[in-house]
Amino acid sequence: MDFFNIHTHIAKHPESEIFSTDVHLFSSVSKSKFLSVGIHPWYLTDHDVENQLEILRKAIENKQVVAIGECGLDKLKGPSMEFQTSVFKKEIALAEKHGLPMVIHCVKAYNELIQIKKSTHPQQPWIIHGFRGKEALAKECIQHGFYLSFGAYFQEDALRAVPIEKLFVETDESELSIEDIYLRIAHARGMELKELTESIKKNVERVFFKP
């Protein structure tokens, strides 16, 4: 049974996970088969942003890279929202140019994120990773075309509100196994584990490995 993990910082199963790394660590990553690389809002620096963007431009030419991220907006940590937004829009442009989905970090900035999506009209999928919001927020995100990825901690009502074709599963930094998280999610949604794994596999193939 395949338990695909779309976002992890702890490499364990290279054939069935996407290892997420920030641009400043990209050169040290070698073991993982599939990578996502981006400029995390926590690590944005005004004096070094052009270098960060140049590393990202070069990194996404690597065939291991199947997504841009994590990237996004964070009101609790990082530089000003204006600066975060300007860099995020440049990452959006790169994702569109290279046909790559985006794995998004969003903290207390969902209104801003939705407005950016509405104004930029992206053609590539946007996945909000580690979603912990409530049911109403989950429904709003789905309405605006986002995919939602759930990890070790989640609101069950929000999880159940997500259509299966918009759902992903991840470990992020958790020490829990991806199998355990799949089991929790299957139980919360009242579905068979095999049905969940097969559905997520289809989503992964459609979003990250499209022909």
Where are these regions (language model features)?
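Mid-domain alpha/beta scaffold segments of enzyme catalytic cores
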Residues: 1-211
